């Protein structure tokens, strides 16, 4: 599509309306490159994405995405084997975290049926290993001391040396106070110094690093701290070297994943762009138009996007209709209507919502041409007419049946009679070429052309004779007429003069009466349509209110059911805890073997009341993502009767499967277990399985990682993990639950507080996970 139309209709200003809604630099780049598309499937895809985003907002009322800088240059540098600085790594860390958050957000979506966005969400990749490593970079762009053992050692030594220097200098401040200009420790060239009065410079031995501008103060590094300061200087150099080494290592970690990270960044930016388009649509009461298979246009209550408080109008361009000619005097809003049509079409073909009501329809044109300039008159120079005619000639040479042509004041700038003839001839050529055209003119001759010619329709802008001002209401099918006599009368022109003027135009009186009747009929039809629209709006508000109440009721019902389930689960947990106590006593007396204890515990669990979870959203979602393929050796499974997780190890000749479930090997039929969906990142690396080894209480500690788990799944794994740890006499275990929303962390705390076998538990030290991990002492 030609770029000139974008300038003429100020399409860039429309794009600026969307800019405030964007949060990522990637989406800003996408907006800047946005242009009208000429392929209906691509436009339809853009509209489907907005519809999907609307569903997300209806269900969740928000779609969170953080501000992200562009990482394109950083990724190019990685491809060139360059190392990234810490700020570049911090931005990539945010992209990785945002990708993970978006994946979890998508997995939690309920009652949303996507048409296009699902492919974007599913193409996002997670990098748990990279994210774990990048925890060493804090949000302030600083490397944490636990980034490497060497960095921790250097910083510890640095802290100790600086503390010793401060202590020595603090003592000297007290002892040599009368020799100092100020009672403080200063810094010069990265070394700690004392501000000594120049007259006493020889009283303190050391190295002079600076002299004040007045010469009254000398900054001396006392000899007592010279060696320590040199040590600090060396340690800082070592620190910089180690930080550079760590940044190099981080860059090497990222290099194999550049293409995937780039794809993630693009998806996040595109989702942000779709979000912005939806918010623009919502705030401006815009809609997603339908796309016609032919050149049909139907814009209902369409508004100009760049005007404040624009007047809404209906415009219908049926398939058979070739041209609409807007006639009537100037200053009535004809040019605005012309631009409104052009901008609505440009926005729609760019995949943007259109400022029109639901049910509106756009066509798909290969090109849109316009000759729109300042209003012309016969007093203007011939050069202006020549300029416009040159442009019109160019349009006629390039336009075809897949084009939309817009002419403002066609034929103006020359003799009225010749101009009107030229305008009719140009419109006739476009009509015969089947090219959709809208033209404005103040020539009365074109009214007759619009009435007498097939597939051409007149239109005009409404004028309020009472207020003597235009209403900017578009009246399709009604030719424009002059209101000169009414205006002159209301402004006080003598009645006999007005009467005489009317007599001089008797030949046009019949036409004017017909136009007046058409105007009256159009206004009456519009009033009826407005009344119908008011009723439709009331019905729409009522339907929305009913839907909102239903959603609120469903939400409250789900909360109550969840609460009841939790209470029931607590009762079951209490019973199971009692059984654990009995089993532990038996184990302590060596009356049962470990596998016999687990079998006994499974029998006890069968006594627990069975809860009907057929309508549980979480379990239903788990069923949805269950692998739709035959099981294979190595697949992760959940044993239905036990609710425990295991791994398929082999298949027997009779079709049954052998599975390792904790420390027990089981034989199962295929209907006794379900497959667990394996994340993409787990396909490229061996799955890490937490194994509790037999050891005494002072031996190695077991670790359970619950990050990314569902609440029910996490609690089940935690219960099984503690069981195995107790059976194997583990004295201490680590549970990694992350920080996240805090749901898993709170669940772990509640479980440990209730479990009688837990002697003590507390968050891990800061360098071992902090509040993202819990250390548990068993006994």
Curated annotation (Swiss-Prot):
InterPro entries: DNA_mismatch_repair_MutS_C (IPR000432), DNA_mismatch_repair_MutS_core (IPR007696), DNA_mismatch_repair_MutS_sf (IPR036187), MSSS (IPR046893), MutS (IPR045076), MutS2 (IPR005747), P-loop_NTPase (IPR027417), Smr_dom (IPR002625). Keywords: ATP-binding, DNA-binding, Endonuclease, Hydrolase, Nuclease, Nucleotide-binding, RNA-binding, rRNA-binding. It is an enzyme of class 3 (hydrolase). Gene3D superfamilies: 3.30.1370.110, P-loop containing nucleotide triphosphate hydrolases. ATP binds at residues 328-335. CDD domains: ABC_MutS2 (cd03280). Coiled coil: none annotated. Residues 704-779 form the Smr domain. One of its GO terms (biological process) is rescue of stalled ribosome. GO terms for molecular function: ATP binding; ATP hydrolysis activity; ATP-dependent DNA damage sensor activity; endonuclease activity; mismatched DNA binding; ribosomal large subunit binding; rRNA binding. The keyword Ribosomal protein does not apply. Its EC number is 3.1.-.-, 3.6.4.-. Homodimer. Binds to stalled ribosomes, contacting rRNA. Belongs to the DNA mismatch repair MutS family. MutS2 subfamily. NCBIfam families: mutS2. Endonuclease that is involved in the suppression of homologous recombination and thus may have a key role in the control of bacterial genetic diversity. Acts as a ribosome collision sensor, splitting the ribosome into its 2 subunits. Detects stalled/collided 70S ribosomes which it binds and splits by an ATP-hydrolysis driven conformational change. Acts upstream of the ribosome quality control system (RQC), a ribosome-associated complex that mediates the extraction of incompletely synthesized nascent chains from stalled ribosomes and their subsequent degradation. Probably generates substrates for RQC. This is Endonuclease MutS2. It comes from Streptococcus agalactiae serotype III (strain NEM316).
């Amino acid at each position: 599509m030609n770029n000139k139309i974008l300038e003429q209709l100020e399409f860039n200003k429309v794009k600026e309306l969307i800019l405030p809604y964007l949060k990522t630099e990637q989406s800003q780049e996408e907006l800047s490159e946005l242009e009208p598309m000429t392929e209906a499937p691509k436009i339809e895809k853009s509209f489907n994405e907005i519809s999907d985003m609307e569903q997300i907002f209806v269900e969740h009322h928000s779609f969170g995405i953080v501000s992200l800088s562009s990482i394109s240059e950083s990724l190019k540098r990685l491809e060139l084997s360059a190392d990234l600085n810490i700020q570049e790594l911090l931005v990539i860390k945010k992209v990785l975290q945002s990708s993970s958050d978006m994946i979890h957000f998508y997995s939690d979506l309920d009652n949303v049926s996507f048409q296009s966005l699902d492919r974007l969400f599913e193409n996002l990749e997670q990098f748990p290993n990279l994210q774990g490593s990048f925890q060493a970079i804090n949000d302030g762009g600083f490397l944490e001391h636990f980034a490497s053992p060497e960095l921790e050692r250097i910083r510890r030594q640095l802290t100790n040396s600086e503390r010793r220097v401060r202590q020595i200098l603090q003592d000297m401040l007290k002892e040599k106070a009368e020799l100092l200009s100020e009672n403080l420790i200063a810094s010069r060239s990265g070394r700690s110094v004392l501000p000594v009065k120049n007259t006493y410079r020889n009283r303190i031995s050391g190295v002079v690093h600076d002299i004040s501008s007045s010469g009254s103060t000398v900054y001396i590094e006392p000899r007592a701290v010279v060696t320590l300061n040199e040590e600090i200087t060396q340690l800082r150099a070592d620190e910089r070297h180690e930080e550079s080494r760590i940044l190099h290592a981080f860059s090497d970690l990222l290099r194999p994943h550049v293409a995937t990270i780039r794809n993630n960044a693009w998806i996040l930016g595109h989702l942000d762009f779709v979000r912005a388009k939806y918010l623009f649509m919502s705030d401006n009461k815009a809609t997603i138009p339908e796309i016609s298979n032919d050149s049909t246009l139907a814009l209902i209550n369409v508004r100009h996007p760049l005007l404040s408080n624009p007047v809404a109008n209906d415009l219908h361009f049926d398939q058979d209709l070739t041209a609409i000619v807007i006639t009537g005097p100037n200053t009535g809003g004809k040019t605005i209507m012309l631009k409104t049509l052009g901008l609505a079409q440009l926005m729609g073909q760019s995949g943007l919502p259109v400022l029109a009501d639901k049910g509106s329809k756009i066509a798909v044109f290969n090109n849109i041409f316009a000759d729109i300039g300042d209003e012309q008159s016969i007093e203007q120079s011939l050069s202006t007419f020549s300029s416009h005619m040159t442009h019109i000639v160019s349009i006629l040479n390039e336009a075809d049946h897949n084009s939309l042509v817009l002419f403002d004041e066609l034929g103006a700038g020359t003799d009225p009679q010749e101009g009107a003839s030229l305008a009719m001839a140009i419109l006739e050529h476009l009509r015969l070429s089947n090219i959709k055209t809208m033209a404005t003119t103040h020539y009365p001759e074109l009214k007759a052309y619009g009435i007498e010619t097939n597939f051409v329709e007149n239109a005009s802008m409404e004028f309020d004779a009472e207020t003597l001002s235009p209403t900017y209401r578009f009246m399709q099918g009604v030719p424009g007429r002059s209101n000169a006599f009414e205006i002159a009368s209301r402004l006080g022109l003598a009645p006999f003069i007005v009467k005489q003027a009317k007599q001089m135009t008797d030949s046009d009186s019949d036409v004017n009466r017909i136009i007046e009747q058409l105007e009256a009929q159009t206004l009456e039809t519009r009033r009826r349509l407005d009344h119908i629209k008011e009723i439709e709006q009331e019905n729409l508000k009522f339907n929305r209110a009913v839907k909102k109440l239903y959603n609120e009721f469903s939400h409250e019902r789900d909360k109550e059911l969840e609460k009841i389930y939790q209470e029931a689960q607590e009762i079951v947990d209490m019973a199971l805890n009692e059984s654990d106590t009995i089993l532990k006593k038996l184990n302590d007396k060596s009356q049962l073997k470990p596998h016999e204890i687990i079998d006994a515990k499974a029998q006890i669990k069968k006594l627990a009341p069975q809860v009907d979870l057929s309508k549980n959203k979480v379990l239903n979602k788990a069923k949805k993502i269950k692998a739709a393929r035959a099981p294979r050796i190595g697949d992760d499974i959940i044993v239905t009767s036990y609710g425990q997780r295991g791994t398929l190890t082999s298949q027997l000749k009779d079709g049954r499967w052998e599975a390792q479930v904790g420390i027990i090997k089981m034989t199962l039929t295929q209907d006794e277990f379900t497959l667990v969906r394996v994340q993409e990142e787990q396909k490229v690396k061996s799955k890490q399985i937490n194994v509790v080894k037999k050891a005494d209480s002072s031996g190695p500690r077991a670790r359970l990682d619950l990050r990314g788990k569902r609440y029910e799944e996490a609690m089940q794994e935690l219960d099984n993990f503690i069981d195995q740890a107790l059976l194997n006499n583990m004295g201490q275990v680590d549970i990694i639950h992350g920080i996240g929303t805090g749901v898993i962390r709170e669940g772990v705390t509640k479980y440990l507080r209730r479990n009688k076998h837990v002697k003590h538990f507390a968050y891990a030290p800061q360098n071992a996970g902090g509040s993202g991990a819990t250390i548990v002492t068993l006994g």
